[in-house]
UniProtKB/Swiss-Prot annotation:
Its cofactor is Mg(2+); Mn(2+). The lineage of its organism: Eukaryota, Fungi, Dikarya, Ascomycota, Saccharomycotina. Its EC number is 3.6.1.66. Keywords: Cytoplasm, Hydrolase, Magnesium, Manganese, Metal-binding, Nucleotide metabolism, Nucleotide-binding, Nucleus. InterPro entries: ITPase, ITPase-like_fam, RdgB/HAM1. ITP binds at residues 10-15, 61, 77-78, 94, 153-156, 176, 181-182. The gene is HAM1. It catalyses: ITP + H2O = IMP + diphosphate + H(+); dITP + H2O = dIMP + diphosphate + H(+); XTP + H2O = XMP + diphosphate + H(+). GO terms for biological process: deoxyribonucleoside triphosphate catabolic process; nucleotide metabolic process. Binds 1 divalent metal cation per subunit; can use either Mg(2+) or Mn(2+). This is Inosine triphosphate pyrophosphatase.
Length: 196
């Protein structure tokens, strides 16, 4: 792996497409997406996820991936926090969706007037084993609503960003990719990488 190649560690095809669409500034001759002087490639790794804050989880994943791949890596952790629950389920949202489904998520807030939620995306960039992990975080405020739109991308169909009348799932991908929590985090990462 070239030192100018960053491996984005994910097995989620939808997430990979979205990250490439947002992050890429060009395409290299070999068809790889580029941001600044870096080419972006992908690898699926089964990394242990510790319990902790989104920052702790992201740092741990980035260090583990860098140790396995012996080079620059990018990892991501996303959380969805309900204001009524003091920002839980937070980084455990994937397990909540898997256990109780999207309707279960909505039902959790049934008795609460406050349906507010924070979608938080944190990317961790690590240049290699023993290197410091740099974090890039984006937040989008919104509300939890009954599921609308396709249900093939996490909790997108139950999250309606503030100021919009559509859920992430109902939005055109191009529009979503200019306002999402992932976009806000990747915008910071792109600035960092293009200035290296």
């Amino acid at each position: 792996m070239s030192e100018n190649t960053i491996t984005f560690v994910t097995g989620n095809a939808n997430k990979l497409k979205e990250v490439i669409a947002i992050l890429s500034t060009s395409e290299s001759q070999d068809g790889m997406s580029k941001v600044g002087k870096y080419s972006i490639t992908n690898k699926s790794l089964d990394l242990d996820e510790i319990q902790g804050t989104i920052e702790e989880v992201t740092i741990n994943k980035a260090k583990a991936a860098a140790n396995i791949l012996k080079g620059p890596v990018l990892v991501e952790d996303t959380c969805l926090g309900f204001e009524a629950f003091n920002n839980l389920p937070g980084p455990y949202i994937k397990w909540f969706v898997k256990s109780i489904g999207l309707s279960g998520l909505v039902d959790m807030l049934y008795k609460f007037e406050n349906k507010g939620a924070n979608a938080i995306c944190t990317f961790g960039y690590c240049e290699g084993p023993n290197a410091e992990v740099k974090l890039f975080q984006g937040v989008t405020k919104g509300n939890i609503v009954d599921s609308r739109g396709p249900t093939d991308f996490g909790w997108d169909s139950v999250f309606e960003p503030e100021g919009f009348d559509q859920t992430y799932a109902e939005m055109d991908k191009k529009n979503k990719n200019t306002i999402s929590h992932r976009f806000r985090a990747l915008d910071k990462l792109r600035d960092f990488l293009t200035n290296q």
